Amino acid sequence: MGQLYMQRFENWGAVSKGDFDQTWGVALQTFAKSGNWGGVEKGVRHIKTYGTSWGGYALIEVDDPAAFAHYQAHHYQNYGHVARVTFEPVSDMDAMFAATVEQLRSKSTR
């Protein structure tokens, strides 16, 4: 398994509807072609996109740093004028703490 990233896209407030719609058109074409928002054929796997009132998140898995660099560059070149885009590495804390939680549960039931 590669590194998980939570990608955040926050819409800029002063963007015209035309620019916003045109950019989403590019984004949807990119996704339809490659299966992800960054247009890479392999090395970045799209898991899920979540929308919010201000933009949203996309959860991705990265296996190839060069592909991730291309993925990021695509965002900055094509979407940066309508949204602030950031990428945060995330980890599965449920899995990380599972053994400790299980030990605590077993102690509390004695």
Positions of the model-derived regions?
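Conserved short beta-strand edge segments in small beta-sheet-based binding/regulatory domains
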Residues: 79-92
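Short amphipathic alpha-helices in soluble, non-transmembrane regions
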Residues: 69-77
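Short S/T/G/P-rich N-terminal loop/turn motif that feeds into the first structured element of a domain
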Residues: 1-55, 63-70, 91-110
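Short, structurally constrained coil/turn elements
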Residues: 38-40, 78-81
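Short, charged/polar low-complexity linear motifs in solvent-exposed/disordered segments
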Residues: 24, 75, 86-88
